[in-house]
Amino acid sequence: MTEFWLISAPGEKTCQQTWEKLHAATTKNNNLAVSSKFNIPDLKVGTLDVLVGLSDELAKLDAFVEGVVKKVAQYMADVLEDSKDKVQENLLASGVDLVTYITRFQWDMAKYPIKQSLKNISEIIAKGVTQIDNDLKSRASAYNNLKGNLQNLERKNAGSLLTRSLAEIVKKDDFVLDSEYLVTLLVVVPKLNHNDWIKQYETLAEMVVPRSSNVLSEDQDSYLCNVTLFRKAVDDFRHKARENKFIVRDFQYNEEEMKADKEEMTRLSTDKKKQFGPLVRWLKVNFSEAFIAWIHIKALRVFVESVLRYGLPVNFQAMLLQPNKKSVKKLREVLHELYKHLDSSAAAIIDAPMDIPGLNLSQQEYYPYVYYKIDCNLLEFK
């Protein structure tokens, strides 16, 4: 289960005691969760008014950054066009897997200096992730256009003889070219009707050249045949052919056009290969950047909410729980017993809908302790 609960509770005599009590109740004495300390440095508190306003802003920023993280991850999956395992290998944060990064979280002092105000740190994060979001849109648009154009050309060269491009199938020798009077048509003949074609094609219209039809290609259901006739008989031939379930394809042999199409396909295919490597590298780097930013926002939110709930001086322990999938309900009950004394309004019920003004939490997620969920299931495989 790649879901984490990031919680905090006030320090008892020491923060270490708070941690030991939680660890004993959730991990040591039973197997409800894997627990670890979550290290948040001594950030600048600022005024209460600023904290209340920041609480709302961080909630919005959290949702935005999570969205960008998921978009980058999903686009990585789209670009790799590969299995889930292959994608997961590329979704790293600071060079390690996401679970390792979260459980060993260390604040990045270089990126987010703690001498800055909380507001400034949140603005640095917002600016960086907005840039990633904008870059992703432009890079994805360019690559998708290229990929789409290539797929359109590939589709033309796939499918049945009734619909696919015939340029790759036919040769110059299959046609009578540069004749004022004669023209060669290409006809799709169902295999079941091929004997009828052999018997009838010379008489479907006047002025069909005898013995001018050959099988040029075939697919599962049909043959592609050529036939040469006088130009003025073409309309009559088309009509009679259709009545007999023979389909005349609209095709004119033009070497220059066919060469241009081939060159375009080669160019698009080469461009796609050239862009693939740098794009995957960009996605890996910026997934890492966005994910790191997201976890720092979680840390900021825990800090702000802990100060708002537990007061000053700052004295709380942030802790990370990775719930055992089968024990989620029991874990919630144990946490409730541990911390119900922190808030009498939440003491009577667990997971009950409550509307607590000023605290930016969804109704189902108000608990006596500070709580945020981190869900590492970032991909939606179709």
Curated annotation (Swiss-Prot):
Identify one Pfam family in the record.
V-ATPase_C
One GO molecular-function annotation for this sequence? proton-transporting ATPase activity, rotational mechanism
Q: Which InterPro entries match?
A: ATPase_V1-cplx_csu (IPR004907), Vac_ATP_synth_c_sf (IPR036132)
Q: How does it sit in the membrane?
A: Peripheral membrane protein
Places the protein is found: Cytoplasmic vesicle, Secretory vesicle, Synaptic vesicle membrane; Cytoplasmic vesicle, Clathrin-coated vesicle membrane
Q: Name one GO biological process term.
A: synaptic vesicle lumen acidification
Expression by tissue, per the entry, reads: Ubiquitous. Abundant in brain, liver, kidney and testis.
Q: Which UniProt keywords apply?
A: Acetylation, Cytoplasmic vesicle, Hydrogen ion transport, Ion transport, Membrane, Synapse, Transport
Q: Which residues carry this modification: N-acetylthreonine?
A: 2
Instruction: Tell me a GO cellular component.
Output: ATPase complex
Q: Which domain of life is it from?
A: Eukaryota
Q: What family classification does the UniProt entry report for this protein?
A: Belongs to the V-ATPase C subunit family.
Give the protein's function.
Subunit of the V1 complex of vacuolar(H+)-ATPase (V-ATPase), a multisubunit enzyme composed of a peripheral complex (V1) that hydrolyzes ATP and a membrane integral complex (V0) that translocates protons. V-ATPase is responsible for acidifying and maintaining the pH of intracellular compartments and in some cell types, is targeted to the plasma membrane, where it is responsible for acidifying the extracellular environment. Subunit C is necessary for the assembly of the catalytic sector of the enzyme and is likely to have a specific function in its catalytic activity.
- What subunit structure does UniProt give? V-ATPase is a heteromultimeric enzyme made up of two complexes: the ATP-hydrolytic V1 complex and the proton translocation V0 complex. The V1 complex consists of three catalytic AB heterodimers that form a heterohexamer, three peripheral stalks each consisting of EG heterodimers, one central rotor including subunits D and F, and the regulatory subunits C and H. The proton translocation complex V0 consists of the proton transport subunit a, a ring of proteolipid subunits c9c'', rotary subunit d, subunits e and f, and the accessory subunits ATP6AP1/Ac45 and ATP6AP2/PRR.
Name the chain's protein.
V-type proton ATPase subunit C 1
Q: Which organism is it from?
A: Mus musculus (Mouse)
Which gene name does the record give? Atp6v1c1
